[in-house]
Amino acid sequence: MSYHLHISPETRFLRLPGSFLLDSGERLRDVEIAYRTWGALAPARDNAVVVCHALTGSADVDRWWGRLLGGERALDPATDFVIAANLLGSCYGTTGPASPRAPGGPPWGGDFPAITVRDQVRLQQRLLDALGVERVRLVVGGSLGGMVALEWALGDPGRVEALAVLSAPAGHGPWGIALSELGRRALALDPKFRGGHYPADDPPEAGLALARAIAMTSYRSRPGFEQRFGRDRRDGRFEVVRYLEHQGRKLVDRFDANSYLALTRAMDTHDVARGRGEYAEVLAGVDVPALVVASH
């Protein structure tokens, strides 16, 4: 499958010179960042808004947060320089498992190095440096993007003026890690997975669909499932089962299994207290206006 078919023609690319140092100590060479922008950078270089996408998202904010983007909306290109970068490890243009390990060579596949949420912030910092951004008026993101947004405020506090974190914790807890691990194991059990070295035209679709279905059970609360689905049936099958199958099918048509593994493992690393102290004191150190929104 060519994931580039899902990358909008407006996407731009930045190739970093030299190598990019990961949290793990490994270095990635020839890292490319796929990104999009709306609006223009002000002469004072202080009107940037960084938008961080969720697990299987892309830099195309207009596709998934289109209602927030536009004139007199939350993300207004008339006043804001809106920047969105595809996350490291994804399959929508930024370097990831589907990228060549070396120019002209085979893809990384299952050998792609481990990445963290903090790696995402450092990579986005490199992008903003290249774009000439000095101050960030707002960093906003949901789910995995919310984790990245929170790390922005801690990893580059002098640059960020405000923060909006949607449906993201200060640390990815054991329940979330357990569900992600179940999904990863389901994916790996697909015979087509082949240790992460599957051909692009024959990916482990069944495993990825099941991993997605497992994850979807955590994207709503139990009352949310009761309210939406109840015990309703259609054609003899429970609506909730049809919903899970539908979500799985949708993902396999557009996302890479190895990217799913890489990014869920990155989520597992999210812990603002790691190497910084206790949660309360670390979060108290975020001294910019912050909007935190929980989901139900």
Where are these regions (language model features)?
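Active-site nucleophile elbow and catalytic-triad environment of alpha/beta-hydrolase enzymes
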Residues: 246-247, 262-282
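Alpha/beta-hydrolase-fold enzymes
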Residues: 159, 165-250
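Cap/lid segment of the alpha/beta-hydrolase catalytic domain
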Residues: 73-128, 177, 181-195
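Residue-level signal for short, function-critical loop segments
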Residues: 169, 294-296
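N-terminal cap/lid subdomain of alpha/beta-hydrolase-fold enzymes
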Residues: 36-102
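Conserved hydrolase catalytic core segment
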Residues: 135-178
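Catalytic-loop region of hydrolases
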Residues: 1-48
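Short beta-strand/loop motif that positions the catalytic acidic residue
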Residues: 286, 292-294
